[in-house]
């Protein structure tokens, strides 16, 4: 049997569609016919009716219809389903034949055309004689027909044509060849589909009618056949629900058949076909659980029906195909929108199909192991006269034989031999790899990494069996990483063993060495004798000799490999193989550890490299070298031991590079760091351990960083979580798990032996030249030189502080914006042992708040390291936080000449500006001077002189000044009028004369200025006396450009009598002044209220007496009347 026997037929797997043939179309030479055909078949959308079209000539011979049986009494079927039946009804026997004919209703030669059309229809009927196939006629017309009933001629001629062709009116169609051709074609399709539905319905009834004549004794096969045919016709009719129902019935009937070795293959074949149909329809109906349940039932029923033991591999092949087909159906359903999950996806079915394909391979290897002298039978028992079997699932040498007894055992034996010999030619590995590849793709899609890796291992092994070692190695190498990272050491060992065989058979030196190194290591679960063999082979390779063959390899492949190894040895090339071990687990472990996280530059840097071998025998290495990020140190960290390649496993009790299995070996390295690396990190970039010698071959094991391989991280985690007590070891040995890799260290400067002291008087005052005295004293035993000072604001603080902080060495002059915030590398000379010096640094802080200041002193000193003279740079820094505060608080207020608080002032009316300085400094302050800098809008009433010169203020004390000002009329200014600045010059009382005076500028507040229409000024003595005349003059000044009508009245007071106009009305011209004179006569002593002056402005009713009383006094102090004395007593007084 051919290896493609197990593939399902195409007609079974496709979607059944109604078959309609089109005749009368010349699609080659007639453009109209070609356009009609293209409209039927080109670019069919999913929403169009499911019909399969085919163009055939009018006289095409269709398959002959067999005569119908009237009785099945003596009929014995020869099989279940003929191999050509499905194809016949899909592609050969149409449900409808459509005759296309070009004929218009107004055709002049109508009779002749009608007769020709009837003849064509009759020819088609003759070729379909005995079948129920429907016939229809389509008239291709050039004109668009009129609506039904309007064209009388068309109606008459259509009836006549139907009569001539013996057609019903429903089987005659008109197809106008217009711009809307596709629309007409779609309507035609729908009509054809209805005719096809009728045909398949008739066929179903015809098949059902046969069942009445069947009996269960001799016609069991026919029950299955008829049920399958009904289901298949239902599918063609697109009645999928009834199709599924009938397929299920047919499936049950198949398993009711009496099974025997002679018909078991036919039963399984038909069961597989029907199961495929059931599962396909379940997926189509979006009931995947039903499909899965049906498939499981199918497998449970069939997995024990093996058949002939000599052909057991056929059953495995059949089972593999069942799983593969279901996987294909499942995957197709997913592409159409079905949702799968991790635990239920097509990958599991492809995996099971691959499993049965592997079983098939093993069975074939066991059953088809004939000697070379056995030849293929002649004549070929697998050949048939027609080239194909008559019935599905039957043997070619006994087709149609239903007897359970083998009439010709010899013929049966020859047939089985032919099948076995054919099976030997099947490339099973290709089948298995294809199925595994499909499964891997599915598990990758559904994020099942372990299943994917497991199947990739099987693929690699299958490639190995297929002798495609390159692909096998590629796959196995890909999955090793997963098994290493998760610690599946047994699985990893198995994979490595296969990979080692592949690399040996291809004579791949580097791969062979790499896998050997890992199989010798702690991750390998091989026994010691196997490891010893691999170790011996590895040493042979390093000695430029061929290794011994790996066990269980194909004999022919081994012979080819031995030739390749001979060629490898003879070829001249690079004999050094560098292998990075961070991605696998070699037989040597490495850990590097610096003694400390940092080293002073005047102390040698020391670190240990720990090595531990896990191979079965002691082994000697030739070289150990360490690489750093600064390659200048590499030369100091090399251990080398000259030895021959043959000494790798000899003289192992001697030599410093010998590693004993299970024992930790420590190598100490030290070197002197360069002064240029102070402040830098020294890092071990790699550790190289060389096995072998350059005379033969040598392997360089390269650890990145300070060591560690693919298993180190997991082992360290397990060790940290373990509560197991570690056994005690001798003092010279250490526990490997207790060693922690430390691959980097910092080089820091030499410890300084100087003292740095800071002297200052905090807090600092804003804008003052704050003095910070730095005292540096040397405690070194030798002179230090090139002493430099860096002082100022510590970097990394707020940028605003940097802009407002300035540092200088000269305290006699003020800093400006050009001075930096940090003075760097100020040379201060050399210092002898015990000598000290002072340096004053002045800082000006422009804003309040905390600042961190840095004082950094560096110097050079000669020192001896490991007997070598070296210049070391040392430094010491001190930081201090200084708070900056305002030296004093300044309060400013505006008052009237009566010392009443003013919210606003009035144009040209004098007012008072009062300042109050409150000392906020903890130190005494000296106010050197003060100055009032008026804005142009303000004028002084009298001379502006400082009233606080040379005043010393202690903490909490205050000093006040008062200035009389006048503001001319400036109109309506929004936001008020600027007053000016108040400048205070001050310094600390304790400061020396050379310290500059600090000027603090206070911006005075703006004031609102209002214009008043009338200004009243009173001119009166400072006090009065009882019963003595008190002259008072009121000056009324018109401040407007209008003539003012003024009403004046004086209200008497109980404390005074007065003479003058008690009530008067007068006019005051613009800009002029009017004087009113009154004589007040005090009657009582004490602080008395004056007679009240009331003014009413007719033009300005808002001018109130309350406003008036801001300008004139309302009371005066009256002294009591004194005794009469002479002039001498007055003079004496």
Swiss-Prot record:
InterPro entries: TPC11, TRAPPC11_C. Pfam families: Foie-gras_1, Gryzun-like. It is found in: Golgi apparatus; Golgi apparatus, cis-Golgi network. One of its GO terms (biological process) is vesicle-mediated transport. The modification N6-acetyllysine is found at residue 245. Its main location: Golgi. Keywords: Acetylation, ER-Golgi transport, Golgi apparatus, Transport. The keyword DNA repair does not apply. GO terms for cellular component: Golgi apparatus. Component of the multisubunit TRAPP (transport protein particle) complex, which includes at least TRAPPC2, TRAPPC2L, TRAPPC3, TRAPPC3L, TRAPPC4, TRAPPC5, TRAPPC8, TRAPPC9, TRAPPC10, TRAPPC11 and TRAPPC12. PANTHER family: FOIE GRAS, TRAFFICKING PROTEIN PARTICLE COMPLEX SUBUNIT 11. Involved in endoplasmic reticulum to Golgi apparatus trafficking at a very early stage. Belongs to the TRAPPC11 family. This is Trafficking protein particle complex subunit 11.
